[in-house]
């Protein structure tokens, strides 16, 4: 019987993974550990592996997988910047991802957390906690229908986000290297700078690559409309975090919401209760009154989890049986 290791198992995924194994006549072993130099030897007797990595995979894992006869790694996220695709290819390892598992879920998160900032919910909540129930100008908002929203990246998630904002009646500008002609309700601009210059809300939906690395830094924030709101449910490396904090502090941004953080791997998805966080930048984000931080959780719905579990396992089995899969990256 074919054997697949399901690394990075969450409690809520285990039953889904085992049920998939029964339906597909595959022996699935679940493990809470991640694929790494320390765990790769567990795969000696396996045919395939799926995992959910957040940090960079060590280079010595690829040749070890090759020596064990394993031909693939099925990543259970859309992002894949934790892998060296060229090195994997050199060792005959197919890297795959799950490019679309519930774009609407992430879009709903992006809009809902932006609305918290638009409606000044953090400020209002702090006032209520001190029993200040007054109405003041600083907590007055304006309707989204009177706003301009910039969507940076109009793939599946960005497109779904744009459609929600369109339902509010917002004016929508966008930038993408490959414009989507079906999104005829928005206006594409020739650059990110043009797309954001009049935006009240900026929503980021681009992958992590050389072009997007620190795309939003001080130079980019200099082109932002004063008082704008920034939402990042894409990848942490898209933002230069110290520059983001500075932009909020000096009033360039009214506020920001980030679901991804460049150095999140050590902390996000882990319980750090009663432990010291050594990352001063992360602490500054968490403690900032005008920055909302969530732990890479925008995708987190029952539909998305099911699709990620099955997407990873389907890709692994496809490579085992055919040598390739529809979602291969290298």
UniProtKB/Swiss-Prot annotation:
Its EC number is 1.1.1.28. The keyword Mitochondrion does not apply. InterPro entries: D-isomer_2_OHA_DH_cat_dom (IPR006139), D-isomer_DH_CS (IPR029753), D-isomer_DH_CS1 (IPR029752), D-isomer_DH_NAD-bd (IPR006140), NAD(P)-bd_dom_sf (IPR036291). Keywords: NAD, Oxidoreductase. It is an enzyme of class 1 (oxidoreductase). The active site is at residues 235, 264, 296. GO terms for molecular function: D-lactate dehydrogenase activity; NAD binding. It catalyses: (R)-lactate + NAD(+) = pyruvate + NADH + H(+). NAD(+) binds at residues 156-157, 176, 206-207, 233-235, 259. Belongs to the D-isomer specific 2-hydroxyacid dehydrogenase family. NCBIfam families: PRK08605.1 (NF006374), PRK12480.1 (NF009127). This is D-lactate dehydrogenase. It comes from Staphylococcus aureus (strain Mu50 / ATCC 700699). The gene is ldhD.
